Structure formats: C-alpha cells, structure tokens
Amino acid sequence: MKTIIHAKNIDKKVRLALYGMLHHSATKLFPRRMKNVSIKLHLKHHIYDGEAMIEEEYSDRNPKHFKIIIDPYRIAIDDWGRELNYSEWVSTLLRTLAHEMVHVKQYIMRELTFKKGAMCWNNMKVGWMSEEEYYCAPQEVEAYGLEKWLQLSYTASWNKIESGEI
C-alpha cells in the first residue's frame, strides 16, 4: 500500500502513529487488496471532521486511489465545546482516521458506491436529510462500530512497541 501524509506542524511521533494506523487499518479491513491501494492523507481545514473519497482523476468503477481529509482543528474540540488536551487530540485523530479507513474499505469492496450522483449502499440508494438519518445510515453504523475496534487494537500494538515488548 502506498501512503502519503500531507500535514504541517505535526510532530514525528504523531506522523508515525498515523502511518501505523493507515497500515493497521488496511491489514484488518482489506488485507488481500492492500498492495494495489494508494491513500493520501491530508490534515487541513475542512467542512467536516473527516472525509474519505475516491481520488477525482481515477475511475470509481474499481477504486484503488483514495484521499482522506481530516480537520485537525475541528477535532480539537469535543461535542461539548471543550478543548481536548494533546493526548486526547491524538486519540481522536487516530479514531477519526480509523473511521475514514472503514469508508475506504467500503469503497474497495463496492459496498459504498455512487450511481448517477446518488450514494448507494449495497446497490440501495441512501440519502439523509438530518443528523439523525446520517448516524442511522448503514455505512456510518459500520464505520462508527469498527473505528473503536481499530483504535483499541492499534493502541495495544503501539503500546507494546513503545514498551519494547515487540
């Protein structure tokens, strides 16, 4: 898997953790298709906390090239308006990346597609008008469910590496 991270003012340890989470998530979610996939991760201002998309210049019939955008400024504040401390921010950053990697998996496995401009989940059109409908959409139910598992399993591996057990 080819990965590139575009980010400014991010320390080396966090950058390594992001590369690690990209690889860990791909290994868990789409191990047989990893070698053909390329992912560009951008940390920059964005209208959403995070978004995964098929790269525009490539076909969406058999997607292999992806772009993930995460807004590190937006995720620095929790749902109650509290500013996160550094370790909470890093944890949220990794969890958001895990969530977006689930969407990448959905694109790769053709579970999440776009037909005639409409988003489809397993060939059924899905759309939402409200925040409640967004959280009930099948692709989001899966992504929110798997993000925590990916984060916990990756953190356990990272802690073993840091302590010298691996």
Model segments located where?
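Catalytic Zn2+-binding segment of zinc metalloproteases
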Residues: 100-117
